């Protein structure tokens, strides 16, 4: 064993290839441990300690020290002062596991020749890994983390016990050319994902987010933010000062502020907005935008988009593509909300029927969740009650209320439900589904292959429904679902034949053997029906 002792000045010391003990004493010393398993103490002063081979124990002592492990393990103590640990494993091809919080790393994870790295009292960490599949978790220090060509995961290890703050400081992360996952929920100063297809999870606290080459996905979680921010992926910036580039797919969760989000050239945008007055412009891909109860302007752009609003006086425009637009408010506020499906076959769903809706080009569907107001609806008028104006709607999904309703639609494949009361349903042309509900209902399918539906929740064990134009040759069906076969005592075509009676008006089918609970098919004879015309589900 060789012992090397410095002076009170600034020394340059080197160990041998054997096991050494090296003391730098005072002064700003530069010490290279050499070969062997060495013990190195920098002493007072701003020292530079380097280990290149063997398993060395390095102590910086007092002062702001720089301690480097080059391709090897070791045990490091920073000592007093602001100390930096550099771990350079760029030439290591095996997997690395590294936890800044626990002060521990493993080189050659799951191999027979693994080595440990232990460290404590370190204020700044600079870590570079090689081509293995690495798992790197930062510490509460200011870290610079660069990974190599493997499929790596970089992120915070956990949270502290008091306030839930992630155990990362002001960091820089560079993951190299692998398909990496960067999970930094506090926000590193700089994130560089490098080549390949990467996933970045962070906040708007980051100064630079660069996905690099490849197909990169960015998730921004800032649900607690209420100050209102702008994120423009097309221009590559956020109003927080964050620069964003190299991102193909983005997901953004924001808080209750009035926020602006512009997709730009993104292939896909997913946005969860709060209750502020938000503006979101989607891109050319399939976007998903959900907003709260503020007065929002949501534009899907090209692609098959989904737009969701919880309420408010909104502008919801799907743009090109087969879009889905959902408005969840119980009313359209002051009537200022405007919904435009744009080109494509769109679905527009509203809870309460009020406002202005333009389906745009294509074959568009209007679905009203709540029962219709009033008792009469005729699609040809372009109005629904006194509060909804619509145009360019080809298909309707509507239900009546508890009164005696009259619902008439046009040429689309409509779904109409009468609910309670003695209702009149007319589907017009198209392949319609008509549900009479309770009461004495009159149903007209119109041209097309129509389905007349009975289910377990439409019976009050009373009422005779009438179908005015049942045409088996035209593809019309009688459909019994749920517990309807049990309720009607008809669960096969043979049962239907046994319950049928030909009258001067047509064919009457008695449900449960009753004269006041059944179905009348106008101008239909029993011979006109076959088992193919009745479906039991």
What are these regions (language model features)?
Residues 1-2, 113-128, 134-137, 248-251, ...:
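Low-complexity acidic/polar repeat-biased segments
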Residues 264, 469-470, 480, 509-511, ...:
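Beta-strand-rich, repetitive solenoid scaffolds
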Residues 3, 108, 219-220, 243, ...:
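Intrinsic low-complexity/IDR segments
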Residues 110-113, 185, 240, 255, ...:
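Short strand-coil-strand connectors
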Residues 1-16, 126-128, 251-253, 261-263, ...:
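Extended, small-residue-rich solenoid/repeat segments and analogous flexible loops
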Residues 10-14, 19-97, 101-104, 133-242, ...:
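Acidic, glycine-rich calcium-binding repeat modules characteristic of RTX/beta-roll
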Residues 103-112, 116-118, 164, 236-243, ...:
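Generic recognition of long tandem-repeat/solenoid scaffolds
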């Amino acid at each position: 064993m060789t012992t090397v002792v410095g002076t009170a000045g600034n020394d340059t010391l080197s160990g041998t290839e054997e096991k050494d003990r090296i003391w730098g004493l005072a002064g700003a010393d530069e010490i290279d441990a050499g070969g062997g398993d060495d013990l190195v103490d920098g002493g007072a002063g701003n020292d530079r300690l380097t280990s290149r081979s063997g398993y060395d124990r390095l102590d910086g002592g007092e002062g702001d020290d720089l301690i480097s492990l080059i391709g090897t393990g070791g045990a490091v103590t920073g000592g007093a002062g602001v100390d930096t640990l550099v771990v350079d494993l760029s030439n290591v091809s095996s997997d690395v596991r590294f936890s800044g919080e626990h002060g521990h790393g493993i080189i050659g994870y799951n191999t027979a020749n693994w080595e440990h790295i232990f460290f404590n009292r370190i204020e700044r960490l600079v870590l570079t890994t090689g081509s293995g599949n690495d798992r790197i978790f930062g510490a509460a220090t200011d870290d610079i983390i660069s990974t190599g060509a493997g499929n790596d995961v970089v992120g915070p290890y956990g949270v502290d016990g008091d306030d839930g703050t992630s155990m990362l400081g002001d960091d820089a992360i560079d993951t190299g050319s692998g398909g990496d996952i960067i999970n930094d929920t506090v926000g590193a100063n700089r994130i560089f994902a490098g080549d390949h297809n990467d996933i970045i999870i962070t906040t708007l606290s980051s100064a630079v987010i660069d996905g690099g080459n490849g197909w990169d996905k960015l998730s921004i979680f800032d649900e607690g933010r209420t100050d209102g921010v702008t994120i423009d992926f097309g221009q590559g910036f956020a109003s927080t000062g964050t620069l964003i580039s190299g991102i193909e797919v983005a997901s953004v969760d924001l808080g209750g502020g009035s926020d602006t989000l512009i997709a730009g050239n993104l292939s896909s945008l997913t946005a969860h907005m709060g209750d502020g007055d938000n503006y979101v412009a989607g891109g050319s891909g399939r976007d998903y935008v959900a907003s709260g109860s503020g007065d929002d302007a949501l534009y899907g752009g090209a692609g098959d988009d989904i737009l969701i609003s919880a309420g408010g006086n909104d502008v919801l425009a799907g743009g090109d593509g087969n879009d889905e637009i959902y408005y969840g408010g119980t009313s359209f506020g002051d009537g200022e909300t405007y919904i435009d499906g744009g080109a494509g076959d769109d679905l527009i769903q509203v809870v309460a029927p009020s406002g202005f809706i333009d389906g745009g080009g294509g074959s568009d569907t209007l679905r009203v969740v709540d029962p219709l107001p009033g008792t009469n609806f005729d699609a040809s008028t372009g109005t629904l009650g006194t509060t909804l104006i619509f145009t360019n709607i080809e298909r309707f999904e509507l239900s009546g209320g508890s009164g005696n309703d009259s619902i008439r639609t046009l040429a689309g494949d409509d779904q109409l439900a009468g609910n309670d009361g003695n209702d009149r349903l007319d589907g017009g042309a198209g392949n319609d589904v008509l549900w009479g509900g309770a009461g004495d209902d009159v149903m007209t399918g119109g041209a097309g292959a129509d389905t007349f539906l009975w289910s377990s929740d439409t019976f009050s064990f009373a009422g005779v429904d009438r179908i005015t134009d049942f045409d088996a040759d035209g593809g019309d069906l009688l459909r019994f679902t749920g517990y309807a076969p049990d309720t009607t005592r008809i669960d096969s075509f043979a049962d239907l034949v046994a319950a049928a009676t030909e009258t001067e008006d047509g064919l009457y089918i008695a449900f449960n053997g009753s004269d006041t609970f059944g179905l009348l098919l106008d101008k239909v004879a029993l011979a006109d029906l076959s088992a193919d015309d009745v479906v039991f589900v």
